[in-house]
Structures are given as structure tokens and as C-alpha cells.
A protein has these predicted regions:
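Post-transcriptional modification and biogenesis factors for structured RNAs
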Residues: 1-201
């Protein structure tokens, strides 16, 4: 059984930070819903689970071939970024999602956020875009890391169902959307048209 001092656990704990995720090309997904969604997407490399959680989620773990490591409760707490650890955490590969790949599919609707910094808000946008049938979400400008734990939880798994693209250059991203034939509409607090009248566009 792995403890919080185990090298494998210590390496995974570094994925709580953006720099750690970027360097490793991996992220952590916690809880049965997110882990199940990540497993279905084929992103899970390994799973850390306590004995109690292993019994509770036996069917979920048995249905996939990812490496499963039993961990102590203290290790599970170190791997968690929530107040109440679920005892089930997956180490996942960051998906390589590019805007050109999304546009190659001739999308009809793409949700774009600009300079969104709050992970909960970003996750909510991803969840809503998925529910609306959008082909992708673009986080443009200096935006939050979509694989931040809070963003993952706010997306309620939608981040595994819809491509999410990080595009630091806002102008270039908008230009690419227009070049692909998409009409670009923006919302603003002081916009010229109310949303109720937007169907005229």
C-alpha cells in the first residue's frame, strides 16, 4: 500500500499545480464521476484508491485496465484538493486538443471565453457548452487552466465530452474561427443589443 511519502504519490501530488501539470503532461481527476468519464475517454494512466473506496467502486475499477494502486487515507488526502477526499483519484494524460483539429470538423457552434480566470466559471461554461451541443470550448487569452481541480469538478465531467482548446492569442483564435466560416457574436455588459433580441442576428 502506498503512503503519502511514496515516490509515485509524491509525483502525482505535484499535478495539483499548473506548472506540474504542464511539465508532466498529466492531471488529476478525483471522484467516481470524473474518474469514470476520464476512463471512458481513455485518458487514465493510473488510479489511486483507498481500501474503502476500492470496495465502493469495485465495478468501476474492474471495468477498465488502468493500473490501480491502493493508498492510505493520508495519501488520499494528499492527492485530493477537496475538503472531503473521495479516496479515488486518477492520474490522467492531458489531451492534445488543437483548434485546427476542431475546425476541420466543420463545427456549427463553438463557445469562446476571453480572459476567464475563475476555474468554477470556466467549468460551468464547459458544462453549458456541452449541454447546448457546442462542438468545442475555446479558453482564449490568459485564461485558467481547464484541468485545474475546481474547473474539472464544475464541468461535472463535460470536459471529457467536449474538446477544450487553450488559445493564448485571442485575435488569432477569432481570425481562425472567421476563416472557418463561423459568425462571431460577443456578449458584453454594455452591448448594443439585448439577448432577447439576438435572434435577429
Amino acid at each position: 500500500m502506498l503512503t503519502e511519502r511514496s515516490a509515485r504519490v509524491a509525483t502525482a501530488v505535484k499535478l495539483h499545480r499548473h506548472v506540474g501539470r504542464r511539465r508532466a503532461g498529466r492531471f488529476l481527476a478525483e471522484g467516481p464521476n470524473l474518474v469514470a468519464a476520464a476512463l471512458a475517454r481513455g485518458l487514465v494512466r493510473e488510479v489511486f484508491v483507498t481500501e474503502v473506496a476500492a470496495r465502493r467502486h469495485e465495478l468501476l475499477l474492474a471495468a477498465h485496465e488502468a493500473s490501480v494502486h491502493l493508498v492510505t487515507e493520508r495519501a488520499a488526502k494528499a492527492l485530493s484538493d477537496t475538503v472531503t477526499p473521495a479516496g479515488l483519484v486518477a492520474g490522467c494524460d492531458l489531451p492534445a486538443t488543437r483548434l485546427e483539429d476542431v475546425l476541420a470538423g466543420s463545427p456549427q457552434l463553438i463557445a469562446v471565453t476571453v480572459e476567464i480566470r475563475e476555474p468554477g466559471n470556466a467549468g460551468t461554461v464547459i458544462r453549458i457548452a456541452d449541454a447546448m451541443g457546442a462542438a468545442a470550448v475555446i479558453l482564449a487569452g490568459r485564461s485558467v487552466d481547464p484541468y485545474n481541480g475546481k474547473c474539472l469538478r464544475a464541468s461535472t465531467g463535460s470536459i471529457f465530452a467536449i474538446p477544450v482548446v487553450v488559445a493564448p492569442d485571442v485575435g488569432a483564435a477569432i481570425a481562425d474561427l472567421r476563416a472557418a466560416g463561423l459568425q462571431v457574436l460577443a456578449t458584453a455588459v454594455d452591448g448594443e443589443m439585448a439577448l432577447d433580441d439576438a435572434d435577429r442576428l
